[in-house]
């Protein structure tokens, strides 16, 4: 601290100018909160300034939507700066400070439906993020911690058997042949260029400690140390979401079990569920999605209203910021927090069934207004427009 500066004076002089900012962090970081927390540190040395710097550096604007503007530096960041993060989380997820995320539920047998008409559903995918307990999250982790995560996770993956068995490809030693194969399969992730990851520190030391693992069937995939410690993905062509969810649950359970055998656990908060880098990715951190062809509904002005009522989001065929090719959209659940994994997959399944029915009716020249009650009664979790635009998973 500067000589002759009191704690309060330093806080006032160091408070960031957020007067022209348009992000969630800036909406909730009052001077009173900053003065309360600026000199607090987590057990790993993470400060509030570390958590908010990405939002200070990237103010956003009203034309491109409201970015999150903050990250967690470790699993203690939430509890250490609780009053601030509670406000951020409530805006993003409509999840109040007294709410509690439910227990994990990966039981595929409780899923109702989930096998779609392949005339409409071209592929199914479920992915989630997870973090290794006791290690800083990517914005604050050291090279040693990143390499430890790579070792712990890749060793666990090496213990998978039968249809989950596969191979790990470290980015640092990847040869041209393997790289070409991964690019062809659309598995390879590149160095992050987005503001959240670069200014928060997630992309430091690239590609050190990063890698990709996939099973021999190429329908179960794991990214290590991209935005989060672990990204687990189950996918396949066609309309069998039940099979995708079953494989996802088995793989996720086995990876966690194999890690525990070596003395490592996943980060999980009693109130918020699983913890990852961005406050948008809490709870289940699950994004279930389909590539869905809607040649008729896409032309109807009610398309976006249907999606909103079903609590679903849409992207182009190639993902975020891409266009739909051959009327095919990436449709996914918006919520991450407040319901179990199985419940969120059910939200997607129910919603996709409604969208397919609407498309069929429009093709036949039939009305779709009577589907509205089904939309209003559909299961799901409310989530803000902020989260719908900025879920990074």
Swiss-Prot record:
It comes from Hediste diversicolor (Sandworm). This is Glycocyamine kinase. Transmembrane segments: none annotated. Belongs to the ATP:guanido phosphotransferase family. Its EC number is 2.7.3.1. Disulfide bonds: none annotated. Residues 367-393 are annotated as: Disordered. GO terms for biological process: phosphocreatine biosynthetic process. The keyword Transferase applies. It comes from the Eukaryota. InterPro entries: ATP-guanido_PTrfase, ATP-guanido_PTrfase_AS, ATP-guanido_PTrfase_cat, ATP-guanido_PTrfase_N, ATP-guanido_PTrfase_N_sf, Gln_synth/guanido_kin_cat_dom. GO terms for molecular function: ATP binding; creatine kinase activity; guanidinoacetate kinase activity.
